[in-house]
């Protein structure tokens, strides 16, 4: 294998960026921990945990990148994919569910010989797709855009705010975050690896996309970011020796607690400025013209329309009738 340099993805020397000698299909594979990787460039960021039980993925990426994702995982390990955990319902996170799951193998091997339960309990012998019920609701809706085949839907859905399992000698928690980026967001915490997969609650490439039409809200976004901060630990007191909890955002580079704090503070500050302008009876157009996110536009507002979308989402969220 050879080491490659990818600008902006490594946050410190403890993170290695590796590519196999053969082509990685344009994807960036970041070694986060000895048995933990992040795959970037396939839509939303994908987390890969590897151990004796097999492979656990968080997110499957965009449908168009499925073959490249499968190839990248095979270069990391020959072990089968056992679980695909969905962190949200957006197409760039769940688009690869069907094909990726079918490259894996169920953990419920005792049911494979029973035709009455094999199709549901074992996902037809494929890897299980695990997600909060809100994600299943979004993906299976008649008017879902894009529409998803049934084999892409979660095969195990849970209603409670917390789902826990143990794979590869590690506790894994899936923590539902209501009304944040949307109504279908979850954090996935890997306890021993000390990694949190945040989905699009945190996006290091732009202002957060708050999907009001699908249940998102500015207060829910802030609440979720506060929860994310609580889940992370800074590398104190040995800040020059160790690293703290790693956070895999929905898009962009690997992060740590301080970057989550900065992102939360940015969201709160812009929210507060918009709220103050609303109190002054400013219209949405007037608020946009005032550029309340100006201090952060060069960092998070370079994509077309993203700043106005963020301001509009804050305005509509704050002025919505209770």
Residue locations for each model-derived region?
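Bacterial N-terminal signal peptides
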Residues: 5-16
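Metallo-beta-lactamase
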Residues: 21, 26, 31, 54-56, 60-64, 116-180, ...
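Accessory terminal helices/loops
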Residues: 14-20, 106, 236-244, 253-322
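Active-site metal-binding motif and surrounding structural segment of the metallo-beta-lactamase
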Residues: 52-56, 64-115, 125-127
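Intrinsically disordered, low-complexity Ser/Thr- and acidic-rich flexible linkers and loops
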Residues: 106-123, 234-242
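Divalent metal-coordination and catalytic microenvironments
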Residues: 35, 49, 59, 73, ...
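Conserved beta-strand hairpin/beta-sheet module of binuclear metal-dependent hydrolase folds
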Residues: 27-74, 186-199
């Amino acid at each position: 294998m050879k080491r490659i340099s990818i600008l902006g993805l490594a946050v410190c020397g403890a993170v290695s960026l590796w590519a196999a000698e053969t082509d990685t299909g344009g994807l960036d594979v970041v070694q986060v921990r000895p048995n933990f990787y992040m795959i970037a460039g396939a839509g939303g960021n994908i987390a890969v945990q590897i151990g004796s039980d097999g492979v656990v993925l968080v997110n499957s990426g965009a449908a168009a990148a499925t073959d490249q994702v499968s190839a990248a995982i095979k270069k990391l390990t020959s072990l089968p994919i056992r679980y695909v955990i969905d962190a949200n319902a957006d197409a760039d996170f769940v688009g690869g569910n069907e094909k990726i799951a079918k490259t894996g193998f169920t953990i419920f091997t005792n049911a494979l010989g029973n035709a009455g339960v094999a199709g549901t309990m074992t996902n037809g012998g494929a890897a299980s797709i695990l997600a909060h019920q809100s994600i299943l609701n979004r993906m299976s809706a008649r008017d879902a855009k894009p529409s998803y085949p049934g084999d892409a839907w979660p095969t195990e859905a849970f209603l409670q705010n917390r789902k826990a399992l143990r794979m590869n000698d590690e506790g894994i928690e899936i923590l539902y975050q209501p009304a944040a980026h949307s109504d279908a967001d979850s954090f996935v915490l890997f306890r021993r690896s000390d990694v949190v997969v945040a989905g699009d609650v945190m996006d290091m490439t732009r202002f957060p996309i708050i999907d009001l039409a699908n249940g998102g809200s500015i207060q829910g976004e802030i609440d979720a970011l506060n929860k994310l901060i609580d889940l992370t630990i800074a590398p104190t007191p040995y800040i020059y020796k160790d690293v703290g909890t790693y956070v895999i955002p929905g898009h962009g580079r690997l992060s740590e607690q301080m970057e989550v704090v900065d992102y939360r503070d940015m969201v709160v500050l812009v929210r507060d400025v918009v709220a103050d302008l609303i109190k002054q009876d400013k219209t949405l157009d007037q608020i946009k013209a005032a550029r309340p996110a100006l201090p952060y536009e060069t960092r998070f507002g370079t994509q077309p329309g993203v700043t106005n979308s963020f301001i509009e989402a804050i305005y509509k969220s704050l002025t919505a009738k209770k």
